[in-house]
């Protein structure tokens, strides 16, 4: 069960390692429906690893392997498929591109063109043409989340064999700036960047003072409303907590951005004791006494982003 030390681990190989040795570890928890009162379904690290291999197997005949980190865009609802896509295309040598759905057509096209993207993946219910128009990229719909996670049968294993030294500078994800002052600029994330976060989460206590981010390594259920096309929702509060640590990220509804109301429901029905949200969510909650009362069991409230 030997594991590379924190700061030298790689998401694809570490997910596979944990799926082998700690298969029942809870990676995340997802809503059973858009009605959050219906409860949440836990996803184990083994479920997550299988879903990645299933998607890699599905995509290999369509996009093949890349030796030059070809860009593969993905558009979908707010669900775990964003994280599955990141690792699945990485195992095939590609890098994922996420363009925020709120972006205008010119913004989407700018990101596709500047990253030399010729392949677009999407969920079945997404109208890609409304986002990218007649862009020449080849388009492929991917399976439903439930099929990727829990289809019968064992998918073929797609190993990630590179060492940390070989992969640390390799790109695996492209996000972008806000575009508030012009066209959004691509931000390429490397495996080395993700490893830096691994190191950061494992900084030991200094003179008895615990580094706050080390709490990511402790076991807790945490509601996060950061979208997966944002670095917060994809890496920092998407992959990192459940792979580098033991926080179980509880996801919001897939069909809409979570407001303060949904955040309260995530805490209530997802049994959360931690929150990761933007200041606007807290403003909504503190101005509603009923919601505020439901937050009594929350022992940590983290915030980030604009209002």
Predicted regions, residues:
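Adenylate-forming
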Residues: 18, 48, 52, 72, 125-129, 255, 270-307, ...
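Conserved AMP-binding/adenylation subdomain of ANL enzymes
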Residues: 195-221, 228-276, 280-282, 288
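Structural core segment of the AMP-binding/adenylate-forming
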Residues: 87, 91-165, 271, 278
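Conserved AMP-binding A3 loop
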Residues: 42-46, 172-200
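Conserved AMP-binding/adenylate-forming
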Residues: 38-42, 56-103, 219-220, 224-227
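N-lobe entry segment of adenylate-forming
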Residues: 1-68, 162-165
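ATP-dependent adenylate-forming carboxylate-activation enzymes
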Residues: 32, 76-77, 94-112, 124-127, ...
